[in-house]
Amino acid sequence: MIYNYPRFPGGKTKAVTLSYDDGTVHDIRFAEILNAYGLKCTFNLVGYRVANEECLTHAFIRENILGKGHEIANHGYFHRAMDTLRPIEAIRDTLDSRLTLEKTFGIIVRGMAFPDRTVNRHQKPELYKAVKSYLEDLDIAYTRCSGGIENDTFMLPEDFHNWEVTAHHNNPRLMEYADKFLEIDVDAQYRSRRMPRVFFMYGHSFEFDRDQNWDYLEAVCQKLAGREEIWYATNMEIYNYIHAYQSLVYSADGLLVYNPTLYEIWFDVDGILYHIKPGETITLRDEVHF
């Protein structure tokens, strides 16, 4: 075995995911559009707004967000920038928000987008290290970064607590990035570059209302939707699937593979596509296809 790469469910080589913040009333129209096109989004909600049903009702979130396969994630209880807080304040803000979301909707919430400003490992490495440590203690599985960092390579993150987006929807190059993403033939890449790709757009739904460009959102959805090679997933669905892939157990020679997870997992080994069911052990072919 020379190269082993994950493939998304069904053997797909690409995924599209969205991440939108704050839980404002504009999420109602936003969710309607996404649902019409079959795109999936992670809605990052502010705890105190949820507790007080300030913008969205609990019924709407249950029926039109969670009920349509989207994710809700943590965006702080008071939407406070974590780089301005003492650790104890940031921990409480994060935990209070998580507890509110979980108790209100009866689900486990392990995803997060940094509120107000990103804590990025490249820009603020020491602060990021400290923040990541207590987020892990709080069982936050991933955190989305934003704010000037673009990932137009579409690669999966090496560190899910520093998950960099492709672009904000207002980025003037967004459609260019979308075309670039769609044109990539992953399996035709050089063998050391056949990693799966993810197109990751973020923003705030109120920006479409403010800028009067809901038609632009529809144009983006039309471009990305309905493609056989793409898995439309939430942030947490991608995290969980990749975590399951990373949990596969191999024999010393790499030819026996055991799946201890509850996921059916697809992966490419030296040009051959495999899938393995939960609890299954399979034998890989001892050959290489370039």
Mark where each language-model region is.
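Short, solvent-exposed loop/turn segments at secondary-structure junctions
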Residues: 23-25, 48-50, 77-80, 116-120, ...
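Histidine/acidic residue-rich metal-binding segments in metalloenzymes
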Residues: 59-62, 181-190
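Structural preference for beta-strand elements that scaffold enzyme active sites
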Residues: 15-17, 40-42, 69-73, 109-111, ...
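C-terminal domain-boundary segment and adjacent tail
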Residues: 2-10, 38, 52, 142-154, ...
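A short acidic, amphipathic alpha-helical/loop segment
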Residues: 29-33, 130, 216, 220
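Tight coil/turn sites that cap or link beta-strands
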Residues: 272-290
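Active-site beta->alpha N-cap acidic-glycine motif
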Residues: 1-71, 78-81, 93, 99-119, ...
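Catalytic domains of cell-wall/extracellular-matrix polysaccharide-remodeling enzymes
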Residues: 81-183, 212-216
